[in-house]
């Protein structure tokens, strides 16, 4: 950590957690995973170590390091692939089961990117423990899907009772999104267009 961040104090993170834990302060943590650096056995060790801080550490998210082409002079890192993502998910879900049995919380959470990269469906709402890590990209896709389908069901019921559309005739709209979220937006758009033939997205 000190070498990667070029900061000799960067290795003191757990000391700060110790101080906050001793004071009974509630925390939520994040592990930024770097391929070949802190994944695999190192990730498993980190999870086990952070479990010692329960219940004051309420949740920990695991997110892949963000990489761009502008990395000149930075620590050399490689992007994760689908197999890597599957292994990360499997390890996290293993410890989710352990934490549920021991502490009645899933505790460790995989960000949405892992499931998308691995080609797996995101977990059900219950696995997110109230979306404690939403700001870290954990559960955003599940929350979006659930809220969309709830709203669509309400609209179908309203339409069946004679409610009119908020527009007349046909309507065309455009959505801008990134590559990761595209499959989900596409799926929801198709469901919406199927329900409303005059709508084109």
Language-model region placement:
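Core AdoMet radical
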Residues: 1-20, 26-38, 57-65
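Short, solvent-exposed loop/turn segments at secondary-structure boundaries
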Residues: 3-5, 39-41, 73-79
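Aromatic/hydrophobic pocket-lining residues that form the small-molecule binding cavity
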Residues: 13, 43, 85-88
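Short amphipathic alpha-helical segment that frequently serves as the phosphate-/nucleotide-binding helix
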Residues: 14, 44-47, 189-190
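Auxiliary Fe-S-binding modules of radical SAM enzymes
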Residues: 51-53, 61, 66-201
């Amino acid at each position: 950590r000190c070498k990667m961040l070029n900061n000799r104090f960067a290795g003191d993170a757990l000391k700060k957690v110790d101080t906050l834990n001793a004071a009974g302060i509630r925390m939520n943590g994040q592990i930024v995973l770097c391929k070949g650096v802190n994944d695999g056995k190192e990730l498993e060790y980190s999870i086990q170590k952070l479990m010692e801080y329960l219940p004051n550490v309420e949740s920990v998210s695991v997110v892949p390091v963000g990489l761009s082409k502008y990395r000149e002079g930075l620590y050399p890192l490689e992007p994760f692939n689908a197999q890597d993502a599957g292994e990360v998910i499997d390890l996290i879900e293993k410890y989710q089961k352990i934490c549920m049995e021991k502490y009645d919380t899933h505790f460790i959470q995989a960000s949405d990117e892992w499931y998308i990269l691995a080609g797996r469906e995101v977990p059900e709402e219950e696995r997110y423990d109230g979306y404690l890590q939403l700001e870290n990209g954990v559960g955003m896709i599940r929350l979006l899907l659930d809220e969309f389908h709830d709203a669509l069901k309400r609209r179908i019921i309203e339409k069946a009772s004679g409610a009119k559309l908020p527009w007349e005739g046909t309507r065309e709209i455009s959505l801008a999104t990134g590559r990761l979220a595209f499959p989900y937006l596409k799926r929801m758009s198709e469901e919406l267009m199927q329900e409303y033939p005059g709508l084109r997205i």
